[in-house]
């Protein structure tokens, strides 16, 4: 360019959000995968295998059963996981594969995959997971990512018809969109989804 040597590297930047894919194993069985891409922070890649075991990769590391991540996020025991997901066959198959049985073991197993070879302790694992996923300076879906996430997960349909236990705030302005006690109509649920509200109670 203008007499100077330059190297042009093309790069594909994917927008924050959640992406789904379906593949097939050698017998033609459908294998599902999804990737959660934040604006800033670790990617989460989910996939199923031919045995219906559900795995996750955190930031392109080696895969672990998804129940390891669930335990590390605070839902530690098999009973708590079953209470949350019901008798979902893929979760039951995954629990059979998962050697961890509680929160601390889940934390340690996940830490081993993310930081192989480093000294292992519950405190260091806890601090890593907290900083990776719960520190807004390190993990952020951004408004567009949150909007797309909510839209793909049909957030609107799941909250319509329910009564709010807490006020719903607009994450951009802090203003109250709907007050506690309101039973949400589809239009109100739409407003909440379009405002990229991360959660409601």
Residue ranges and their predicted role:
Residues 1-201:
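N-terminal non-catalytic structural scaffold regions of very large proteins
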């Amino acid at each position: 360019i203008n007499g100077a040597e330059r190297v042009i590297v093309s790069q594909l930047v994917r927008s924050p959000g959640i992406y789904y894919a379906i593949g097939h194993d050698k017998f033609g069985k459908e294998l599902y995968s999804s990737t959660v891409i934040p604006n800033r922070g670790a990617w989460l890649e989910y996939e199923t295998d031919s045995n219906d075991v559900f795995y996750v990769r955190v930031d392109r590391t080696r895969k672990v059963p998804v129940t390891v991540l669930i335990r590390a996020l605070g839902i530690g025991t098999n009973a708590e996981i079953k209470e949350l997901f019901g008798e979902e066959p893929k979760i039951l198959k995954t629990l059979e594969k998962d050697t961890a049985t509680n929160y601390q073991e889940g934390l340690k197993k996940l830490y081993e995959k993310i930081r192989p070879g480093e000294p292992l302790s519950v405190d260091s694992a806890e601090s890593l997971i907290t900083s990776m996923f719960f520190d807004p300076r390190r993990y952020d879906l951004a408004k567009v990512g949150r909007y797309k996430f909510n839209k793909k997960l049909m957030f609107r349909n799941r909250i319509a018809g329910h009564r709010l236990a807490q006020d719903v705030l607009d994450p951009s302005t802090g203003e109250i969109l709907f007050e506690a006690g309101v039973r949400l109509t589809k239009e109100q649920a739409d407003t909440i989804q379009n405002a990229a509200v991360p959660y409601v109670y």
